[in-house]
Structure formats: C-alpha cells, structure tokens
Amino acid sequence: MKFAEPAASKNGAYLFCYFLGNRPNEERICFAVSKDGYNFTPLNDNRPVIEQKLGTRCCRDPFILRGNDCFYIVATDMKSDDGWESNHGIVTFKSDDLIHWYDECAVDFHSFDSTADADKIWAPQAMYDEKTKKYMVYFSCHNKNSEKPLAIWYTYTADFKTFSKPSELFSSKSGLDVIDADIVKKDGKYHMYYKDECVKTIAHSISDSLCGEYREYENNVVSCTERHVEGNCMYNITGTDTYVMIMDLYVDGGYYMQQTEDMMNFLPVDKKDFSLDFHPRHGSMLHITDDEYYKLIKNFSK
C-alpha cells in the first residue's frame, strides 16, 4: 500500500478537542496538542478540561472554533446510558483564552416546531457565514415520527444561545442515513465530508454556498480503509496545500489518518507517522498560535 508523506507544518500548533467513551465519566471534553499536526499529546493527563453543569451533564462529539472575538465549543448534549434515541439538544461554551470556559448553554431542539419530536441531535459543528454575519450550526438530526432518514440539518446563531428554526441542509440521494458532517472551505467551494451509515464509510459532496445545495457525485467515498469509521475531522497543515482527515475507528478502537491536496483523492498516513494513542473519540481540530500552545501546556501541566 502506498502511504502519504507527512507535510511539514510551517507555523503555529494544533488543538484537538475530543471525548473519551460511552461511560458517563468519559462523556467529557478533553484537549490534546501538537506542533506538527500528526503527533498529539493529551493535556491535563487526559482528564476533562471543562465541567458541564447543564443538560445531561454529559457531552460527546465536541467541536471547537475560533469566533470573531472569542472561542466556542458546541457538543452533543447526551448521556449514552439513557439510550441512543434519548438526545434532543446540544450544549455550548465560550472562552477568551481556551483555558477558562463560561456562558454554558443547553439548547433543547424540542422547542422548535421542525424538531419537536427529534430523538437524535448529534455532532454539531459551526462555521461563520459571511453573507448572514452569523454562525451556521449544522448537525445530524432525526425526528422519531418521520419516515425520513437521519440527515444533516442547520440553524443560525449570533451568540450560541439563541438559534433560528432548524431546517434540513443535506440528505443522501440514496435515502439512507448520513451523520457526522464536517464542512471545509477551500478555493471558494464548500466540501462536506460525512459518514454513510449504511456502509460505514466517509463520503464527499460539494457546494458553492455554505448553506447548500450540496452535490453528490459518483464514487464519492473518500475513506481509504474498509474498517468502519465515523467522526471525521479535516484540517489543513499550516503553510502547505495538505489537508489531513482523521477518523474514529469506533468498532476496532483508535484513529485512522489520511491526507489529500485536492480534497477528493486521499492516501493513508502510515501508523508510524502519527500518534493519537490516548483513546480519543469523535473530536475536532483548531489551529492555534505558538503563544496559545505554550499557555495551554503551562496551565494544564500544573
């Protein structure tokens, strides 16, 4: 098998935000950092960095982003011990320095007519929309009284506290379930990578606009492995044309890594060339400055 050559990161560092597992004490937000984008070290001895106080007090699939004047985390508000159809909300946090998190908000999507009977609100992510000057939050959604499959829905917010009425963003032409969407903008195009729940692979669709329409194409599976994967996360190696995708090997355990330069054709990264060996589950990546990197290490090494 041909493997990709790791790219040389030019500046800054990387913050990986993730959770650990299906036990209540593992459904917590953890951090890891890297200087090269391939080899990661957990912070705080791989223990939670945020104490969730609202909602179920358990969260999964955390997504971290740099806002216009602060940082945000959005996550699935869910205690899996309550069942996989028990979740109908998300939880959000805000920070000025990546260390101290506040303004926690639990958002119940049963408060909206369009998701009043939702039994799955999973893996929220967000991207700033220059057209609306708001953040588009997108997530996997299923309404229990609907014959429609799991699909990707979206809502808009300015403050991660109040949200617009959710609507469907993308569903597969196959009519089968899709989850775990991750949208990456490059060269004016929006690339959505998502899990096909039928075959347990990562597929790809493209749009000219953040809020769609996302177009599927033939042979759009991009994951390089036949093992079951989900929780895909894509990020750029700074100063290069290389984009890395990491995926949760949720059946076998561990993580799978692959990379691309054209957003469509990937090569796997050899296991010897990356390190994510602290049992992370579905997470997200944030580019950080050297100053932010060293402050995180200093704070969580106490």
Language-model regions, residue ranges each:
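Carbohydrate-active catalytic/glycan-binding domains of CAZyme proteins
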Residues: 1-302
